[in-house]
Amino acid sequence: CRRADIITYHVNANDSTKGMINKDAIAKMKDGVRIVNCARGSLMIEADIKAALDSGKVAGLALDVYTNEPAKESVFFGMPNVVATPHIAASTAEAQINVARQAAEQVSDYLLKGVKTNARNGDKI
């Protein structure tokens, strides 16, 4: 990440990813980096990112996820170097159609072939 102009985060929220966008990670980034987080708000230490935005270490931030959702307030709202949108990245018509199709295919695969795909509780089925 020392050479990247833009770093995007697309990971699950869990104990190992909580707070992964923090002052230590930012210190390893290129000066003027731009960060995109459309994964989960819990990845961010907001105070660390805000300080980096204020100092110019981070040139810009784009996000649609927040520590507290729905976000009525955020330290990032109103900052000129931040693009903040509601958490709607997966709410397009196309995304919803794809999710419905995938769910139907996975149910069909299980019923017809006994194949379990993406089952979090597969051992209980």
Where are these regions (language model features)?
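Rossmann-like NAD(P)-binding element
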Residues: 1-20, 28-37
